[in-house]
Amino acid sequence: MSSLSPLFITVIVPAAGVGSRMKADRPKQYLVLDGKTVIEHTIENLLAFPMVNTVIVAISDDDPYFDALSIATDKRVIRVSGGEERADSVLSGLEYVQKNTLSQWVMVHDAARPCLRHSDIAKLIEAVIPDHLGGILASPVRDTMKQANSDLSISTTIDRSVLWHALTPQLFTTELLYTALKTGLEQGLSITDESSAIEFMGYQPKLIQGRADNLKITQPEDLDLAEFYLQKMKKEINE
């Protein structure tokens, strides 16, 4: 990592979603996990990584929760207006990065992934920065994958050896990701993550294998598992 030490990276955290699948009284990023909200765990973990100098959080203008958090007063945390879709929120963050010339590289990380290991961030940076393009953390598919018909009968079994779960962070140059997202949105493309926007431009970002415990909290049962992983991480740090 020493060869990359002068480099600083801005992280964009899109957090304007409501997370309806959680069936909770508030967006999932504001649910309490091990004494803090999910998004506080996520942001504090990112800021603790030495190469991260700023975290930009894209939040709905009518969000009533974020400003009440202690993390909101951290000078390294910048709030911008989130959009209707993830891509709109990330683009809003990128516009701030460009306007203020914050960094050449940006990472995008899900607000609901609080269990990210610093070793995975370092692994991503080491693999991607020399490539001058970008890449994402990903996890190989382990289960047998089935393709379904509209009536939920099985159409076929898919070869899982070529399938990966896309995780975050996803790391790209600021200029490239800005161009890709702006172009994709203008063309009405379905942009499900940052890599897909880059792929639409004809590029092939790198897959860097990350830990499977970097889970995204999506369902109610994920909270207990995430709390277990967080406590395990704390125990390892203190040993």
Curated annotation (Swiss-Prot):
Which reaction(s) does its UniProt entry say it catalyses?
2-C-methyl-D-erythritol 4-phosphate + CTP + H(+) = 4-CDP-2-C-methyl-D-erythritol + diphosphate
Cite the Gene3D superfamilies for this sequence.
Spore Coat Polysaccharide Biosynthesis Protein SpsA, Chain A
Q: Name one GO molecular function term.
A: 2-C-methyl-D-erythritol 4-phosphate cytidylyltransferase activity
Cross-referenced InterPro entries: IspD (IPR001228), IspD/TarI (IPR034683), IspD/TarI_cytidylyltransf_bact (IPR050088), ISPD_synthase_CS (IPR018294), Nucleotide-diphossugar_trans (IPR029044)
Tell me one GO biological process term: isopentenyl diphosphate biosynthetic process, methylerythritol 4-phosphate pathway
- Highest rank taxon of the organism: Bacteria
Marked site, Positions MEP for the nucleophilic attack, at R160, K216
What this protein is reported to do is described as: Catalyzes the formation of 4-diphosphocytidyl-2-C-methyl-D-erythritol from CTP and 2-C-methyl-D-erythritol 4-phosphate (MEP).
Q: What is this protein called?
A: 2-C-methyl-D-erythritol 4-phosphate cytidylyltransferase
For this UniProt record, give its keywords in alphabetical order, as a comma-separated list: Isoprene biosynthesis, Nucleotidyltransferase, Transferase
EC number(s) from the headed UniProt entry: 2.7.7.60
Query: Which PANTHER family does this entry report, sorted A to Z?
Result: 2-C-METHYL-D-ERYTHRITOL 4-PHOSPHATE CYTIDYLYLTRANSFERASE, CHLOROPLASTIC
Where does this protein act, in terms of pathway? Isoprenoid biosynthesis; isopentenyl diphosphate biosynthesis via DXP pathway; isopentenyl diphosphate from 1-deoxy-D-xylulose 5-phosphate: step 2/6
Q: Which family does it belong to?
A: Belongs to the IspD/TarI cytidylyltransferase family. IspD subfamily.
Asked if ATP-binding is a keyword of the record, the answer is no
List site positions: Transition state stabilizer.
R21, K28
